Curated annotation (Swiss-Prot):
One Pfam family per UniProt: Cpn60_TCP1
Matching SUPFAM superfamilies: GroEL apical domain-like, GroEL equatorial domain-like, GroEL-intermediate domain like
Organism: Encephalitozoon cuniculi (strain GB-M1)
Family: Belongs to the TCP-1 chaperonin family.
Subcellular location field: Cytoplasm
GO molecular function term, any single one: ATP-dependent protein folding chaperone
This protein's encoding gene: CCT3
Keyword Calcium: no
Residues passing through the membrane, by range: none
Keywords recorded for this protein, A-Z: ATP-binding, Chaperone, Cytoplasm, Nucleotide-binding
Top-level taxon of origin: Eukaryota
Subunit structure: Component of the T-complex protein 1 (TCP1) complex.
Name the record gives this protein: T-complex protein 1 subunit gamma
């Protein structure tokens, strides 16, 4: 008898649209209050007990929010907002959530006057256009000076643990991006061309960028060469073993010598593969799958170093740095498949682990980054800091424009909105409310820096912005200063931040019902 198909029940929550939108604003405000103290150079650290019972010490907005177990769908969408910001530009994860929550909170006052959400969303779209123009007006071009770039990257991680421990994350991030960045295509594929290796123990200052590839693999034979200059490298995808049948195979032997002959045929097949490889005179054979003991001994006799069972991602990076082209089987090997761009192969020890290091490459299109630290928790946090820094460095290369930091860009947007006259009463109020919401960033920077009266400082900042759009908050001292000499941020970070915040608010304002699905 056929089992009955389980039915789903849909429960429509019987709330009024205005009540649901107000609840969304409350949920957003609650989420933002968690990370309110994580903004600026005086940011506080959070100790997070993760879902797998490990401890993280961090002030990264995305790292904190992703560990929260929240029930309200609007709160979940804000957590996704932080993740998107982190994936796109690597910085501004805390700012985007704070902005979105504050803008949504301000819009609820307009909703209370029975203004339709669609009219508010339309006005928000117009306000976003004005904000982008304000950022464009405040933006300055980035010169090719490396010191300026490092200063900007360091500014994005000024509140992180790497700055407290004096680890040169900015230098590492810039060096890594320079190796991976393709100027002709204006692209920087960090995911496929860069790998971070965390090494427990050693000096923090020993962290480095390898101009090649670092692979955590042992050499198969203990007597194979461990240091090779200008190696010829061959990459093979198929195993160097006897090819077994696709399905289960049975052999029947009628004579005593047949079994011996079967073993000889297996050996001959492996020898043929090895002879084909030896024919192109390689120094190193990298195999994606296994290498049999017989093949291993043949390679060793011919002074060839063998590596087996490597990940596809490692093989892809190795191919890019040494110029080798992977082949599916040894029979296809030709001279053009041999990689000769690598200058040095070493089998070295980092901490307690052994690595195969391919360095001194002529035209490296990939790199490995070694991060060292005293404990696992610090290593994990340093890796997060580095990934944030490297994404900021990437945005600098792809879009070489800068904005004044310290809340100056937000105040410039607020000033522009206050100067703009809306086409109707709703637009005018949306502009005014959004301008008020944008001041949340400099306000929190002032609070976190320990200023006694933030409201007085904000009033002074508003007056200064009549003189120029580059005045902001010194997050360390709480003073109102010209931020062009203090802190600059990538244009991509600021534009992405305001776009994401406004779009998220528009999405939440359009929600007028919540449907729960239960089995």
């Amino acid at each position: 008898m056929q089992k009955p198909i389980p039915r789903k029940m849909y429960i429509l929550v019987p709330d009024k649209p205005a009540q649901i939108q107000n609840e969304s604003a409350i949920a957003a405000k609650t989420i933002s209050s968690v990370i309110r103290t994580c903004l600026g150079p005086r940011a506080m650290q959070k100790m997070v007990l993760t879902k797998i019972n490990s401890i993280e010490l961090t002030n990264d907005g995305n790292a904190i929010l992703r560990e929260l177990d929240v029930a309200h769908p609007s709160a979940r969408s804000l957590i996704e907002l932080a993740k998107t910001q982190d994936d796109e530009v690597g910085d501004g994860t805390t700012s985007v959530v704070l902005l979105a929550a504050e803008i949504l909170n301000e819009m609820t006052y307009i909703l209370d006057r029975d203004v339709h959400p669609i009219r508010i969303c339309k006005a928000l779209g117009r306000a976003l256009e004005i904000c982008i123009k304000a950022i464009d007006g405040a933006a300055i071009s980035l010169d090719s000076n490396e010191e300026t770039k490092i200063k900007i990257i360091n500014g994005s991680v000024a509140s992180k643990i790497c700055n407290i421990l004096k680890v040169p994350i900015g230098n590492l991030a810039l060096e890594a991006v320079k190796k991976v960045y393709v100027k002709e295509e204006n692209k920087c594929d960090l995911k496929n061309n860069m790998k971070v290796e965390k090494v427990l123990g050693g000096n923090l200052m020993e962290s480095e960028v390898v101009d090649g590839v670092l692979i955590n693999k042992d050499i198969i034979h203990p007597q194979m060469r461990r240091v090779i200059e200008n190696p010829r490298i061959v990459i093979i995808e198929s195993p160097l073993e006897y090819k077994k049948g696709e399905s289960q195979t049975n052999y029947e032997f009628s004579k005593e010598n047949d079994f011996t002959r079967a073993l000889e045929i297996e050996e001959e097949q492996v020898r043929e593969m090895c002879e084909r490889i030896i024919g192109v005179r390689p120094d190193i054979v990298v195999c994606e799958k296994g290498i049999s003991d017989l093949a291993l001994s043949i390679l060793f006799e011919n002074n060839i170093t063998g590596l087996r069972r490597l990940k596809k991602t490692d093989i892809s990076r190795l191919s890019k740095v040494c110029g080798a082209r992977s082949v599916s089987r040894p029979e296809d090997l030709e001279e053009r498949h041999v990689g000769v761009s690598c200058g040095l192969f070493e089998y070295i020890k980092y901490g307690e682990e052994y690595y195969c290091k391919f360095s001194r490459c002529a035209h490296p299109k990939a790199c490995s980054v070694v991060i060292r630290g005293p404990t696992k928790d610090i290593l994990d946090e340093l890796e997060r800091n580095f990934m944030d820094a490297v994404k900021v460095a990437k945005s600098i290369f792809i879009s070489p424009k800068l904005c004044p930091g310290g809340g100056a860009a937000e105040m410039a947007m607020a000033h522009e909105l206050m100067q703009s006259a809306g086409d109707n009463e709703v637009e005018a109020e949306v502009f005014s409310r959004m301008a008020s919401a944008l001041t949340i960033i400099p306000s929190i920077l002032l609070e976190n820096s320990g200023v006694f009266n933030p409201l007085e400082a904000i009033t002074l900042l508003e007056q200064k912005h009549k003189e120029g759009s580059f005045y902001g908050v010194n997050g360390t001292t709480g003073e109102i200063v010209d931020t062009r000499d203090l802190v600059l941020e990538p244009y991509a970070v600021k534009s992405q931040c305001i776009k994401s915040a406004v779009e998220a608010v528009s999405q939440l304002l359009r929600i007028d019902g919540i449907i729960e699905s239960k089995r």
